[in-house]
Amino acid sequence: MPLLDSFTVDHTRMHAPAVRVAKTMQTPKGDTITVFDLRFTAPNKDILSEKGIHTLEHLYAGFMRKHLNGASVEIIDISPMGCRTGFYMSLIGAPSEQDVASAWTASMEDVLKVESQNKIPELNEYQCGTAAMHSLDEAKQIAQNILAAGISVNKNDELALPEAMLKELKVD
């Protein structure tokens, strides 16, 4: 099985909260698609609560679009990581890590302004697969933690696992 790009970086050295360009690719028409690793917590050290990350999923995607989309950037998708340490964001364009960090900061400020659980978009059984699994309080706590810590940048060349280690870790 081919090794996915996200498994070629050393998760023990990742900073959080931090932005990382996980992948850049070109479409056949020449558009740039960039995938960002938006790491909320340090891998293997902390984990986002299930209700908090789910509520953030509903809020964060809209807020990030509000702050980052523009003439040269259009967000395709923002999805939580299975490990619950952050989100992956796929978009058309190539914004800088600092632009993404600024939009992320503004989005966390927006999360703190949400007044009540009934203001969470698509929180109903028709539009959400687990409508009972939400907590605005937990989402706000995550947002406060991000704002208090500040957002840095993780660079792939600083996190790359050596080839010898990748071979040693490979599962056949």
Curated annotation (Swiss-Prot):
Cofactor note: Binds 1 Fe cation per subunit.
Residues binding Fe cation, per UniProt: H54, H58, C128
Listed Pfam families: LuxS
Catalytic activity: S-(5-deoxy-D-ribos-5-yl)-L-homocysteine = (S)-4,5-dihydroxypentane-2,3-dione + L-homocysteine
Entry keywords, A to Z: Autoinducer synthesis, Iron, Lyase, Metal-binding, Quorum sensing
Gene Ontology process terms (BP): quorum sensing
Gene Ontology molecular function: any one: iron ion binding
Similarity comment: Belongs to the LuxS family.
HAMAP family per the UniProt record, alphabetical: LuxS
Identification of the protein by name: S-ribosylhomocysteine lyase
Subunit structure: Homodimer.
Ion transport recorded as keyword: no
Annotated S-S bridges: none
Role noted for this protein: Involved in the synthesis of autoinducer 2 (AI-2) which is secreted by bacteria and is used to communicate both the cell density and the metabolic potential of the environment. The regulation of gene expression in response to changes in cell density is called quorum sensing. Catalyzes the transformation of S-ribosylhomocysteine (RHC) to homocysteine (HC) and 4,5-dihydroxy-2,3-pentadione (DPD).
Annotated InterPro entries: LuxS_sf, Metalloenz_LuxS/M16, S-ribosylhomocysteinase
Gene: luxS
Entry EC number(s): 4.4.1.21
PANTHER family in alphabetical order: S-RIBOSYLHOMOCYSTEINE LYASE
Cofactor: Fe cation
